[in-house]
Amino acid sequence: MKVLHVLYSKIYTGAEKVAAQIIKAFEGKVDMAYCSLECEEVWDILDGMGIRHYGVEELTPATLSRVIREYRPDVIHAHDMRTSFVAALCCGKIPLISHIHNNAYDARGLLLSKGSFDHYGRV
């Protein structure tokens, strides 16, 4: 099984550390990769941890689709609201996990009903 973790950041703090910890916890059991905005500082950390990573200039359905075609994940694990929406637009039949790390600042101006994510199914 292959899992692609998707984040929208150029830093290595909360959600980024969680994604890296999940990847390391499943090392040798599940093939996982990390995708986020390009950032040499983050890449250096991930390289030091032995984590495969993909960088995108901007996270859009087109750029994420390119990574998906290259990596060919069985599951996509999106780590915030923005990445969840972008991933939902391009994941097709690939199961999507939407992991919201309580970063409510991403939700400003959005009004979502509880059922909004039901459309994408459950993993």
PLM features per residue range, with description:
Residues M1-V123:
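Membrane-interface segments of envelope glycosyltransferases acting on lipid-linked substrates or membrane lipids
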